[in-house]
Amino acid sequence: MLELLKKIGYTLYRIWFYILVALPILVFFPFLLLTTFSEKWYPAFFWLARNLWAKPILYGMGCPPKIVYEEKMERGKSYMLVANHTSMLDIMLMLYISKNPFVFVGKKELVKIPLFGFFYKRVCIMVDREDTKSRTAVYRRAQRRLNQGLSICIFPEGGVPDDESVVLDHFKDGAFKMAIAHDIPVVPMTFIDNKKRFSFTFFSGSPGPLRAKVHSFFDTTDLDGEGTAELREKVRAVILAELLAEQ
């Protein structure tokens, strides 16, 4: 009986999440749509997404963010934001942490998500990891967005591991190659509680604080392509050490 009640609770918690995701999009649809007509209006879209979508979801789920900053981002400067990826709340938490407008680079498959996918396609940089031409196009689009003063966000694991016992999967090169090519600092972040609060396993999750740590930045101005692997592993080591310390 107790197990059945738990499953009912988990199911209701999931349904509540999707209501919180959909409701602001429906209510503010005309304003969100208007800000996607031109790339120069993206900062307005970002403000709406951050303040009227991400924040209500996090607090509505009973997951108030608790952020520790070793270093803070400067207004008007571009960065490469990277973090571990274990939960659908990762997107909302990333939006909460950064006041600087940034653009997500993510899988094209997310376009299929109803309502969310409509805006994802219009404002994010989509990549087909199986298509070399797609990866090349990502660099061109990222360059254009960086020239507009925006930052870029990539989850360098390239997806969420099927095995939830994996603490942190291996990182792919893309985010670090891009940071080096464009001479922008890498901002490592550790999302400590997201997997516990709302993992991709259906019958799981619970309200509670979402702790995250923004680590000291990695400068890339003196690096070239040969430094990609070393930078990648240094950033991964910082995030992994924090995750292991909090287990």
Predicted ranges, named:
Residues 67, 125-128, 220:
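Short acidic-hydrophobic, aromatic-tinged amphipathic segments that line or gate anion-handling sites
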Residues 1-64:
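N-terminal membrane-anchoring alpha-helices
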Residues 28-48, 58-61, 74-132:
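Catalytic core of membrane glycerolipid acyltransferases/transacylases, capturing the structured
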Residues 4-8, 137-247:
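Non-catalytic C-terminal accessory region of glycerolipid acyltransferases
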Residues 67, 81, 104, 154, ...:
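Generic preference for hydrophobic
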